[in-house]
Design a protein with these regions (language model features):
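Membrane-proximal, acidic/low-complexity disordered segments on the non-cytosolic side
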Residues: 443-460
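Membrane-interface, cytosolic juxtamembrane amphipathic helix immediately N-terminal to a transmembrane helix
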Residues: 411-425
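Short, amphipathic alpha-helical segments that act as regulatory/interfacial helices
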Residues: 114-117, 334-345
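Hydrophobic alpha-helix feature that most strongly marks membrane-spanning transmembrane helices
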Residues: 308, 312-319, 342-349, 367, ...
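ATP/Mg2+ or Mg2+-diphosphate-binding catalytic cores
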Residues: 347-400
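Acidic catalytic motifs of isoprenoid enzymes
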Residues: 2-12, 16-315, 319, 381-389, ...
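Amphipathic alpha-helical protein-interaction segments enriched in hydrophobic
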Residues: 324-338
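Long, compositionally biased intrinsically disordered regions
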Residues: 404-411
Length: 460
């Protein structure tokens, strides 16, 4: 499962080209507010278009002796750490490949960071937990990291295994270096408090939209940036500039919220800010009515324009990265986001179904987004696509044209002086490594399912 990410053994890229398969994404479950880890989830949906792993959640022991762990990695990893990677693959699906492609000890820190926040998210999502119990759990969740035996076995959420077996996750958290533990604990605390604050609070103003997105996504970007710096794979500046890190998260989260309008409203969730939609409809769900299409598109374009204002910060952030694996990890979700917004802009399908990046496009983005020149090209291409769709009568036209001009200017200035990034491995190699991890998990899931089916037949 981790062969492509844990070790640096040579492998044939042609094998990936022959083995690559694509399939559509699935749908989530209802639960206010929207789940966290949006950046990962947005990139994950794109990666699923490249390599979908369909498998039921099985006990960690079912996978423990996978042949896909390279021998050196298998010998150096404890059983509890291996179990954490199993949970990572179960809960983050194909996007786990990008985490597993990170260099060195940073890979383990990000894996544990993800699982801790996934556990926190599962508490927030679980509508069977009464508020008088959920609020203190969210506020105090960071303290559970230092309680050896704490777990929660009452959840019925699909990712409940991270709560049922939280002692395994917290053990590996305590095994991390102090600088990693400090970051994870701090972000977990701040996010839990923010989640508790928004449990019964709807997103009203545009300012509250930014605040909500900060709690559930900006903090993820800040935490990841601080982990990058703590690992010394990136300069201290990356972790210290919280404004840029926050923008990375907000851009992804707003893209998620914009794209998922129909799914969310059908399941009783409301994340579009009232300050925006109330200009065009009496109720948020009214935007899906055919007679409201013109107003709906105006509201959609207004929110996309607001999301696009984070792109200059995204460009600056990515241009500061020096490590290739970190760059790939950060750049892939961002280019998926700009491509998604381009597809959504002025698109009636947002109010009728699911707007998805084409499968081939997702693969291309993942393989190409390995350096700043390519990222600039991708951003410029999709910005131009949006520009061509801007209507003369759209209420947000002037703001949209202004932010697109800023993006074009920022991209032009950045391209004039590319910083030299240290390439420990070639971009093609690292892209293939991510595919290896995803495809290995897909293969493992298939063979495991076949083995389980054979076992079931023998047991009858």
């Amino acid at each position: 499962m981790l062969a492509g990410a844990c070790c640096k053994c040579p492998f044939s890229l042609s094998a990936f080209k022959r083995s690559l398969s694509v399939a559509p994404r699935g749908c989530g479950s209802a639960s206010p507010p929207r789940s966290l880890l949006p950046g990962w989830r947005l990139g994950e949906r794109g990666l699923q278009e490249a390599a979908r792993a369909r498998s039921a959640v099985r006990p960690a022991s079912f996978y423990r002796h996978s042949a896909f762990f390279c021998l050196s990695c298998q010998e150096s990893m404890s059983d509890s750490l291996r179990t954490c990677y199993v949970y990572l693959n179960q809960t983050s699906r194909s996007f786990a490949a990008v985490i597993q492609a990170l260099d060195g000890e940073l890979r383990h820190a990000v894996c544990i960071f993800y699982l801790v926040l996934r556990a926190l998210d599962t508490v927030e999502d679980d509508m069977t937990i009464p508020l008088d119990k959920k609020v203190p759990m969210l506020n105090d969740f960071h303290t559970f990291l230092y309680q050896d035996e704490w777990c929660f076995t009452e959840s019925q959420e699909k990712d409940r295994q991270v709560l049922n077996d939280f002692p395994t996750i917290s053990l590996e958290f305590r095994n991390l270096a102090q600088e990693y533990r400090d970051v994870i604990s701090d972000i977990c605390h701040r996010m839990g408090v923010g989640m508790a604050d928004f449990l019964e609070k709807k997103v009203g103003s545009m300012k509250e939209w930014d605040q909500y997105c900060h709690y559930v996504a900006g903090l993820v970007g800040i935490g990841l940036s601080q982990l990058f710096s703590a690992s010394q794979l990136e300069d201290a500046e990356v972790g210290q500039d919280t404004k840029l890190a926050n923008s990375m998260g907000l851009f992804l989260q707003k893209t998620n919220i914009i794209r998922d309008y129909l799914e969310d409203t059908q399941e009783g969730r409301a994340f579009w800010p009232k300050e925006a939609w109330s200009q065009f409809a009496g109720r948020l769900e009214d935007l899906a009515q055919p007679e409201k299409l013109e107003s709906a598109l105006s509201c959609l374009n207004l929110l996309i324009t607001d999301a696009l204002r984070h792109v200059p910060d995204v460009i600056t952030y990515l241009s500061r990265l020096r490590n290739q694996s970190v760059f790939n990890f950060c750049a892939i979700p961002q280019v998926m986001a700009i491509a998604t917004l381009s597809s959504c802009y002025n698109n009636p399908m947002v109010f009728k179904g699911v707007v998805k990046i084409r499968k081939g496009q997702a693969v291309t983005l993942m393989m190409e987004a390995t350096n700043m020149r390519a990222v600039h090209t991708i951003i410029s291409h999709h910005s131009e696509e949006i520009l061509q769709k801007v209507s003369l009568t759209d209420p947000s036209r002037d703001k949209t044209l202004h932010i697109l001009a800023l993006i074009r200017e920022k991209s032009t200035l950045s391209q004039s002086s590319f910083p030299s990034r240290t390439h420990h491995l070639s971009p093609m190699y690292l892209s293939a490594a991510m595919l290896l991890a995803a495809l290995s998990w897909q293969y493992l899931s298939t063979t495991a399912a076949q083995a389980q089916g054979t076992s079931d037949m023998q047991g009858k």
